[in-house]
Amino acid sequence: MTAPSQVLKIRRPDDWHLHLRDGDMLKTVVPYTSEIYGRAIVMPNLAPPVTTVEAAVAYRQRILDAVPAGHNFTPLMTCYLTDSLDPNELERGFNEGVFTAAKLYPANATTNSSHGVTSIDAIMPVLERMEKIGMPLLVHGEVTHADIDIFDREAHFIESVMEPLRQRLTALKVVFEHITTKDAADYVHDGNERLAATITPQHLMFNRNHMLVGGVRPHLYCLPILKRNIHQQALRELVASGFNRVFLGTDSAPHARHRKESSCGCAGCFNAPTALGSYATVFEEMNALQHFEAFCSVNGPQFYGLPVNDTFIELVREEQQVAESIALTDDTLVPFLAGETVRWSVKQ
């Protein structure tokens, strides 16, 4: 039996789902991504959201200004879909290379999504335009009806929104983001070449027991919420199979500690510092390291029609302890796996 590999050399990865926030928070978190990833799809759920070409250009510049010298990083901007969005603005941004994709948040599904879409019909002209110009739609796939249990919202979304939408707009490219259920894993696996998915490290590593048994762990609380272990296992099996329409999307979502550790805590895991090593650990546990590079660095560009990165990075298999916290101007940020010993990390 061969000893496990101590170094993994892979083509530089991309993060196809990332929150960078703004202001001081942005300046703090950007380097954790720009150090490792060549590109990242940046979420538009600021307050106010990014709904115009002008706003996206300005936000992109703020991100680039926060990238340390020596990092070669390209933020890929997205447009936040609203009921009142002008299709011409969206097309202009796409044609000018400002918008890479557009993001569909059902109204009030997650952080800063109150401006989101109230119904698919309300944005049908926009979606039809996206289908025509080949612009990908990124979907937070949960229904938000009060009568639907939070653990069932993704499965309901497939049936009531996603499938009717894809039947109606058969040429639309769709990324089902941060999938968390066996239902979604099966749906994407059985779909055609115009449907892909991202998966976060926390949904591969943990299930709802980890978050709730023996005490509530607020730093594992994110949306979509962690599900049962059968769903976690389905996600792990999907990535381990080498399926090529699933790719890395951390959904790294920083919140200051006092906003996570409170009587009404915010959803989101700040996993940018530890995500890549976490994914490597999962692939190793599943005896699937041969598919790790494709998941991180090839499948995403392939789906988006972009070139793969031409530089490489190395991960090293040696135990390291994750920092307990990261300083902010007037608070701290608790990273995913804070204080824990991890098996894989990016070689500095």
From Swiss-Prot:
<dbReference type="GO" id="GO:0008270">
    <property type="term" value="F:zinc ion binding"/>
</dbReference>
<dbReference type="InterPro" id="IPR002195">
    <property type="entry name" value="Dihydroorotase_CS"/>
</dbReference>
<dbReference type="GO" id="GO:0006207">
    <property type="term" value="P:'de novo' pyrimidine nucleobase biosynthetic process"/>
</dbReference>
<feature type="binding site">
    <location>
        <position position="140"/>
    </location>
    <ligand>
        <name>substrate</name>
    </ligand>
</feature>
<keyword id="KW-0378">Hydrolase</keyword>
<feature type="binding site">
    <location>
        <position position="251"/>
    </location>
    <ligand>
        <name>Zn(2+) 1</name>
    </ligand>
</feature>
<keyword id="KW-0479">Metal-binding</keyword>
<feature type="binding site">
    <location>
        <position position="255"/>
    </location>
    <ligand>
        <name>substrate</name>
    </ligand>
</feature>
<feature type="modified residue" description="N6-carboxylysine">
    <location>
        <position position="103"/>
    </location>
</feature>
<feature type="binding site" description="via carbamate group">
    <location>
        <position position="103"/>
    </location>
    <ligand>
        <name>Zn(2+) 1</name>
    </ligand>
</feature>
<feature type="binding site">
    <location>
        <position position="140"/>
    </location>
    <ligand>
        <name>Zn(2+) 2</name>
    </ligand>
</feature>
<feature type="binding site">
    <location>
        <position position="19"/>
    </location>
    <ligand>
        <name>Zn(2+) 1</name>
    </ligand>
</feature>
<feature type="binding site">
    <location>
        <position position="267"/>
    </location>
    <ligand>
        <name>substrate</name>
    </ligand>
</feature>
<dbReference type="GO" id="GO:0005829">
    <property type="term" value="C:cytosol"/>
</dbReference>
<dbReference type="GO" id="GO:0044205">
    <property type="term" value="P:'de novo' UMP biosynthetic process"/>
</dbReference>
<dbReference type="InterPro" id="IPR032466">
    <property type="entry name" value="Metal_Hydrolase"/>
</dbReference>
<feature type="binding site" description="via carbamate group">
    <location>
        <position position="103"/>
    </location>
    <ligand>
        <name>Zn(2+) 2</name>
    </ligand>
</feature>
<keyword id="KW-0665">Pyrimidine biosynthesis</keyword>
<keyword id="KW-0862">Zinc</keyword>
<dbReference type="GO" id="GO:0004151">
    <property type="term" value="F:dihydroorotase activity"/>
</dbReference>
<comment type="similarity">
    <text>Belongs to the metallo-dependent hydrolases superfamily. DHOase family. Class II DHOase subfamily.</text>
</comment>
<feature type="active site">
    <location>
        <position position="251"/>
    </location>
</feature>
<dbReference type="InterPro" id="IPR006680">
    <property type="entry name" value="Amidohydro-rel"/>
</dbReference>
<feature type="binding site">
    <location>
        <position position="45"/>
    </location>
    <ligand>
        <name>substrate</name>
    </ligand>
</feature>
<feature type="binding site">
    <location>
        <begin position="19"/>
        <end position="21"/>
    </location>
    <ligand>
        <name>substrate</name>
    </ligand>
</feature>
<dbReference type="Pfam" id="PF01979">
    <property type="entry name" value="Amidohydro_1"/>
</dbReference>
<feature type="binding site">
    <location>
        <position position="17"/>
    </location>
    <ligand>
        <name>Zn(2+) 1</name>
    </ligand>
</feature>
<dbReference type="InterPro" id="IPR004721">
    <property type="entry name" value="DHOdimr"/>
</dbReference>
<protein>
    <recommendedName>
        <fullName>Dihydroorotase</fullName>
        <ecNumber>3.5.2.3</ecNumber>
    </recommendedName>
</protein>
<feature type="binding site">
    <location>
        <position position="223"/>
    </location>
    <ligand>
        <name>substrate</name>
    </ligand>
</feature>
<comment type="subunit">
    <text>Homodimer.</text>
</comment>
<comment type="function">
    <text>Catalyzes the reversible cyclization of carbamoyl aspartate to dihydroorotate.</text>
</comment>
<feature type="binding site">
    <location>
        <position position="178"/>
    </location>
    <ligand>
        <name>Zn(2+) 2</name>
    </ligand>
</feature>
<comment type="pathway">
    <text>Pyrimidine metabolism; UMP biosynthesis via de novo pathway; (S)-dihydroorotate from bicarbonate: step 3/3.</text>
</comment>
